[in-house]
Amino acid sequence: MKVIASAPAKVILFGEHSVVYGKPAIAAAIDLRTFVEAELIREKKIRIEAHDIKVPGLTVSFSENEIYFETDYGKAAEVLSYVREAINLVLEEADKKNVGIKVSITSQIPVGAGLGSSAAVAVATIGAVSKLLGLELSKEEIAKMGHKTELLVQGASSGIDPTVSAIGGFIFYEKGKFEHLPFMELPIVVGYTGSSGPTKELVAMVRKRYEEMPELIVPILEAMGKVVEKAKDVILSNVDKEEKFERLGVLMNINHGLLDALGVSTKKLSELVYAARVAGALGAKITGAGGGGCMYALAPNKQREVATAIRIAGGTPMITEISREGLKIEEVIK
């Protein structure tokens, strides 16, 4: 028997950094997916094959007879840790120890870009292996197991990434609680800078500024929280689609300005954001921790133009949409 499952990437639409201080955030699944194929094998071992784990921005240097790989391949290897822990959790849940499983991974999600590649591979693995072993788990249960996988591998996790990846659509997150928002189409373009931001260092930097200058930083964080609430109101409102796009675009630009004020933007991120806006995006902002990683732009009827502008500005564009579905069982072959 063989099972193929897939799980989507995510973007933080609004509220990164301020979420650390108890403010809400909105995240959404996007149509870039990780596919995991799981099958039972005779050998009593776990075999993991990674056919296509994307590590964008490959840099190679040549010096006399030596070749230096400058890209961090540790990030690709780290993905395998999530797969291993996810399989172990499912085996534990199914109470099956001496079983042989082969897992094959292919992915459209770049690793280390802040798009939730680790959560997607964990969720898809849990989905495929649990189905293979006859475990009937709800998407909420799979999200919780995905969260547990992240905690085991990285030691800390809000649970946003695996929840979005398992359930799909829009998720409103506040103080550890999740609310599924109604689905709406968002024609977006994600732009990758080619390098990942140092999340821990950036969070620590914001914390330092918060402690040193609370009278300046607290109002910024409060404003960010209000942007998220306003964005939620727009998504829930009955205004037409075009009006929603306009309002969300304005809120994206405000949120980006506030993130810039915190000091988490970079020259490259700003170049991609402004290139997207000039090309016709209604809004563009950092998604994730900043310091590198990705931005995204809301570009109804302008996705190709915005993608071209991002490429010319030195980024890697990915034209995508919000994914209504989270985890999907693509195929079961008996």
Swiss-Prot record:
The active site is at D161 (proton acceptor). InterPro entries: GHMP_kinase_C_dom, GHMP_kinase_C_sf, GHMP_kinase_N_dom, GHMP_knse_ATP-bd_CS, Mev_gal_kin, Mevalonate_kinase_arc, Ribosomal_Su5_D2-typ_SF, Ribsml_uS5_D2-typ_fold_subgr. GO terms for cellular component: cytosol. Pathway: Isoprenoid biosynthesis; isopentenyl diphosphate biosynthesis via mevalonate pathway; isopentenyl diphosphate from (R)-mevalonate: step 1/3. Keywords: ATP-binding, Cytoplasm, Isoprene biosynthesis, Kinase, Lipid biosynthesis, Lipid metabolism, Magnesium, Nucleotide-binding, Transferase. It comes from Pyrococcus furiosus (strain ATCC 43587 / DSM 3638 / JCM 8422 / Vc1). GO terms for biological process: isopentenyl diphosphate biosynthetic process, mevalonate pathway. It is found in: Cytoplasm. Its main location: cytoplasm. Pfam families: GHMP_kinases_C, GHMP_kinases_N. Catalyzes the phosphorylation of (R)-mevalonate (MVA) to (R)-mevalonate 5-phosphate (MVAP). Functions in the mevalonate (MVA) pathway leading to isopentenyl diphosphate (IPP), a key precursor for the biosynthesis of isoprenoid compounds such as archaeal membrane lipids. Its cofactor is Mg(2+). Homodimer. GO terms for molecular function: ATP binding; magnesium ion binding; mevalonate kinase activity. This is Mevalonate kinase. It comes from the Archaea. Belongs to the GHMP kinase family. Mevalonate kinase subfamily. Coiled coil: none annotated. Gene3D superfamilies: 3.30.230.10, GHMP kinase, C-terminal domain. Its EC number is 2.7.1.36. ATP binds at P110, V111, G112, A113, G114, L115, G116, S117, S118, A119, A120. It catalyses: (R)-mevalonate + ATP = (R)-5-phosphomevalonate + ADP + H(+).
